[in-house]
Amino acid sequence: MAMFTTMTALTLTSLIPPITATLINPNKKNSYPHYVKTAIASAFTISLIPTTMFICLGQETIVTNWCWTTTQTLQLSLSFKLDYFSMTFLPVALLITWSIMEFSLWYMASDPNINQFLKFLLIFLITMIILVTANNLLQLFIGWEGVGIMSFLLISWWYARTDANTAAIQAILYNRIGDIGFILALAWFLLHSNSWELQQVFLLNNNPNLLPLLGLLLAAAGKSAQLGLHPWLPSAMEGPTPVSALLHSSTMVVAGVFLLIRFHPLTENSPHIQTLTLCLGAITTLFAAICALTQNDIKKIVAFSTSSQLGLMMVTIGINQPHLALLHICTHAFFKALLFMCSGSIIHNLNNEQDIRKMGGLLKTMPLTSTSLTISSLALAGMPFLSGFYSKDLIIETANMSYTNTWALSITLIATSLTGAYSTRMILHTLTSKPHFPTPISINENNPTLLKPIKRLMLGSLFAGFLITNNIPPMSLPQVTTPPYLKLAALAATLLGLLVALDLNYLANKLKTKTPPPTFYFSIMLGFYPSIIHRMIPHLSLLMSQNLSLLLLDLTWLKKLMPKTISQHQTSASITISTQKGLIKLYFLSFLIPLLLILLMIS
C-alpha cells in the first residue's frame, strides 16, 4: 500500500510546480502553456498506476499526513480518502483537463493573458481534486469554495463584457445559497458528532437527522444547478469555451452530485431525503430538456443538456445508486467536453457566431469536428455502445426496477426522449442543412492543438463507458434481472426522441407561417423563471421601497416634523397666549355699526 499512496501523492504534487513557476520566473511566457499541458499529461500518466493498483487490490486507503489544529474536543488533520469514487474520478478529470488545456492553446492563442488563464484552469482542477479526495468536512469545504471562486474568475475572464461580469456574479450568488446549506450541515455535525472526519460522522449518525441532510441537498442543488437554483448554468456560457468545457464536464457542476455520493451512507437511511432528491432530479432533467429544445445558441443547448444530465445523476442518488451516479459522471465528462470543444471549433471558425440558424453545411468543410459532434451528441442521447449508453441505460433500468415514485421515473423517460430530440436538432441545423453563413469565411481545422484533444475525447466518447464498466466494477454489483420491455425502455426512449426530432424538423421546414405558438414561449423564455426572479421581483421590491420611502418622507418630514407641524404649533400657541383672534373685518364692522346708529339718532 505504500506504493499506492506514494504514486497518488506524486500525482497530486506534480500539479504544483506549474503554479509556483510563475512566482519564481514571471517572465517565462512562451514555453509556459506547453509546460502546463505537459505537467497535466504527466500527472494523468502517473495517476493510472495507483488506479490500476486499486482495481487489482480493491482496498481503500485513508492517508493522514499533518494535524492542522487541535482543541480540547476537536482535531483537524490533512486527510485523504482514496477509495472507489476518488480513484475512478481522478484519471478521468486529469485526462479531460489535459485535452482542454491543449485545446486552449489553439482557442486562446490570441489572448495576451493566456498564461494566467491556464494557471486558473489548473487551480480549478486542483480544487476539484481536493474536494474529491477529502476525508474531512473542512478539507472538503476548502475544495468546495475553491471551485466556486475559480468559476467566478474564469466565467468573468472577459471582464470588459457586461454579460460576462453579470454571469459570474449570478453564479457566485446562487452558489452562496447552496453554501448556506453546507455550513448548516457543518455546524450540525460539529455539535452532534464532535468531529468532521467522514468515518466518525457516518458511524455516529446511523439514523441521521433531516436537518443536515436538507442542508447537504441544498448545497448540491446550488452547485449542480438543480431547478430553482439553475439560472447561473446557462448564463455561465459567457465565459470562454474551454472554461465551459471544464466547468461542465469534470469540475464544478458535478461537485454537488459528488457531495451526495460521499454522504450516501447517511442518505440511504433517510427515505425522505431520497424521495426529495429523486423528485428534484426528475423535475430538473425534464425542465432542462424542454428548455434545450428551442434554444438557438449552440453553447446554451449544450449547457441545458448538462443541467438535464445533472438531474439524471440526482435521480440516481435518489434511487440509492451512488456507483451508477459516479459512472455517469465519468462517461458524461468525455462527451460533454467533446461537445463543447466541437462547439468552440465551430464558433471560432465562423467568427464567433453561436446561432445554429446561421450555421449549416459544415459536414464537408469541417469533417473531423462534424464527426466528433455527431458521436458526442449520440453518446449524450444514449445511443447503444457509445459511452453514454453504458451509464444511462443502467440508470433507467435500475430506476424501472425500484419501488419509488412512478411519475418521477416516467418524466425521466420523457426527458431521455427529449435528449435525443434536441441532440438531433443541433446536428441537423449545424451540419446537414444549407450553409447560412457568409461565403468569404475561411474555415480551417488542421491545427494539431485542435485535432489531438478532439480525437482523444472522441475515443473516450466511444470506448470510455465500455472500459470503465468492464474494468472498474463496484465492490458489490447487483444482479439485474428485468423483463425485455423494461430492458429496452431506455433505447426506445432515445430512438423515439430521434424520430420525433427528424419529423418535427421536416414539418418545421414546410410551415407557411413563421409565428411560433404560445406554448413555444415557455421553452424559449426558460419557463419565465429569469423574467420572474431576475426582473419582476427586483422591480416590485424596488418600487415598493421607493413608494415606502417617499410616503414615509412626506408623512414624517412634511406633516409630522417641519412645516405643517410648526404652523400648527404656532397657531395653538397664539390661541393660548392671546385673547385676540385677529378678526379685523369683524372688529371694523362692530365699530362701524354703532357709529351708523349714533349718526341716525343725531340726525
Curated annotation (Swiss-Prot):
The keyword Nucleotide-binding does not apply. It is found in: Mitochondrion inner membrane. It is an enzyme of class 7 (translocase). GO terms for biological process: electron transport coupled proton transport; mitochondrial electron transport, NADH to ubiquinone; mitochondrial respiratory chain complex I assembly. It comes from the Eukaryota. One of its GO terms (cellular component) is mitochondrial inner membrane. The chain crosses the membrane at residues 4-24, 38-58, 89-109, 122-142, 171-191, 211-233, 241-261, 273-293, 301-320, 325-347, 366-386, 405-424, 457-477, 488-508, 524-544, 582-602. One of its GO terms (molecular function) is NADH dehydrogenase (ubiquinone) activity. Keywords: Electron transport, Membrane, Mitochondrion, Mitochondrion inner membrane, NAD, Respiratory chain, Translocase, Transmembrane, Transmembrane helix, Transport, Ubiquinone. Core subunit of respiratory chain NADH dehydrogenase (Complex I) which is composed of 45 different subunits. This is NADH-ubiquinone oxidoreductase chain 5. The lineage of its organism: Eukaryota, Metazoa, Chordata, Craniata, Vertebrata.
